[in-house]
Amino acid sequence: MKKTQTWIITCIYLQLLLFNPLVKTKEICGNPVTDNVKDITKLVANLPNDYMITLNYVAGMDVLPSHCWLRDMVIQLSLSLTTLLDKFSNISEGLSNYSIIDKLGKIVDDLVLCMEENAPKNIKESPKRPETRSFTPEEFFSIFNRSIDAFKDFMVASDTSDCVLSSTLGPEKDSRVSVTKPFMLPPVAASSLRNDSSSSNRKAAKAPEDSGLQWTAMALPALISLVIGFAFGALYWKKKQSSLTRAVENIQINEEDNEISMLQQKEREFQEV
């Protein structure tokens, strides 16, 4: 029994060793965005429309490429969600909201780690810092969804343009983020929200090709590890069957020897009588 478990564990670890490194070479940091984002609809419905959520908004989010503001934005979203979570006690009345916010916070925390590990280098950044603003739940989670959408684009194609506001662009007309379209939930943040259309078009053109390469990189090592796993399984089964066959033959031989010994013993006893 112990030998069987040892072989099974060995095969599993071998497949993991073959599969993980090859996939990680193609993926940036996996996909931390889970289906929990679908619960945003319920959360927004539970919160009062006039409830204000404080967020350090990254200036230039509407005019700069997403890689310029994504890293700072996910950090600020993480801080705001943590503050929001503290306002809901973990009791039956607020358990639903507490659970949803906690799950969304974990998603953003994973995005922060990913962006820290894969932040673009040698990029001239904008000197503007995040500005403290207050948003309704609908506005806040519109920004949340847009950041999620920008992260998905970042996974398939990383832009490297400088993050400096053009001198021809005037200051924002309002200190609040304008919400001109109805609140959209996953799939999040339509591409029309991006003013940098040339960057979006390049990403859209590269997305199918990069997605195909990514799936190929995932499927190929999985197939190889599956074949190797079956091969090890077949070898183990063959060895096990051979051992079982020899064991059965040995049992039969022992039984025959015992029967012969018993017959000889009875024959000697009969002769003595």
Swiss-Prot record:
GO terms for molecular function: cytokine activity; growth factor activity; stem cell factor receptor binding. Gene3D superfamilies: 1.20.1250.10. The keyword Ribonucleoprotein does not apply. Residues 238-273 are cytoplasmic. Glycans are attached at residues 90, 97, 145, 195. Residues 191-202 have a biased composition (Low complexity). Residues 190-210 are annotated as: Disordered. The keyword Signal applies. The chain crosses the membrane at residues 215-237. GO terms for cellular component: cytoplasm; cytoskeleton; extracellular region; extracellular space; filopodium; lamellipodium; membrane; plasma membrane. It comes from the Eukaryota. A soluble form is produced by proteolytic processing of isoform 1 in the extracellular domain. Keywords: Cell adhesion, Cell membrane, Cell projection, Cytoplasm, Cytoskeleton, Disulfide bond, Glycoprotein, Growth factor, Membrane, Secreted, Signal, Transmembrane, Transmembrane helix. Disulfide bonds join 29-114, 68-163. Residues 1-25 form the signal peptide. Expressed in the cochlea. Pfam families: SCF (PF02404). GO terms for biological process: apoptotic process; cell adhesion; cell population proliferation; ectopic germ cell programmed cell death; embryonic hemopoiesis; extrinsic apoptotic signaling pathway in absence of ligand; germ cell development; hematopoietic progenitor cell differentiation. Residues 26-214 are extracellular. Ligand for the receptor-type protein-tyrosine kinase KIT. Plays an essential role in the regulation of cell survival and proliferation, hematopoiesis, stem cell maintenance, gametogenesis, mast cell development, migration and function, and in melanogenesis. KITLG/SCF binding can activate several signaling pathways. Promotes phosphorylation of PIK3R1, the regulatory subunit of phosphatidylinositol 3-kinase, and subsequent activation of the kinase AKT1. KITLG/SCF and KIT also transmit signals via GRB2 and activation of RAS, RAF1 and the MAP kinases MAPK1/ERK2 and/or MAPK3/ERK1. Belongs to the SCF family. Homodimer, non-covalently linked. Heterotetramer with KIT, binding two KIT molecules; thereby mediates KIT dimerization and subsequent activation by autophosphorylation. This is Kit ligand. The lineage of its organism: Eukaryota, Metazoa, Chordata, Craniata, Vertebrata.
